[in-house]
Amino acid sequence: MKKNTHPQYQKVLFIDSASGHRFVCGSTLKPDATEKFEGVEYPVSYLSISSSSHPFFTGSKQLVDSEGRVEKFKKRFERKKEASPADTPPESDSTTENASVEKKAEKKRVTAKGSKK
């Protein structure tokens, strides 16, 4: 078996930034920061959202968004919507369409006259 092929598995302290909830879980992450939790020092990884702050698990209808991603997306979407042309289809060049229709009608007249002779 090859040596040094698998990442080191260790216990890491995860901290939810939105709610402040802390929990220890095994992980291959290698964070630089450390913090004491229940008398033991663990490497620390900060989460933007976890089961303690996610609306599905909390039962609330609001999303706790510490970074403002939702607002940024809404603003960007509104700007894009305003900048885009109206939802109506673009007007076609009616003169080109009329000319092609007239040519087809003329061909039908010519073939109809030729078939009578």
From Swiss-Prot:
Highest taxon above the source species: Bacteria
GO molecular function, a single term: structural constituent of ribosome
GO cellular component: ribonucleoprotein complex; ribosome
Renumbered residue ranges of the record's region Disordered: 75-117
Residue spans of biased composition, Basic and acidic residues class: 100-109
Keywords: Ribonucleoprotein, Ribosomal protein
Record bears the keyword tRNA processing: no
Ribonucleoprotein found in the keyword field: yes
Pfam assignment, any one: Ribosomal_L31
InterPro entries to which the protein is assigned, alphabetical: Ribosomal_bL28/bL31-like_sf, Ribosomal_bL31, Ribosomal_bL31_B, Ribosomal_bL31_sf
Disulfide links within the chain: none
GO biological process entries: translation
HAMAP family: Ribosomal_bL31_2
Oligomer and partners: Part of the 50S ribosomal subunit.
UniProt similarity note: Belongs to the bacterial ribosomal protein bL31 family. Type B subfamily.
Protein name per the record: Large ribosomal subunit protein bL31B
Biological source species: Protochlamydia amoebophila (strain UWE25)
Lineage: Bacteria, Pseudomonadati, Chlamydiota, Chlamydiia, Parachlamydiales
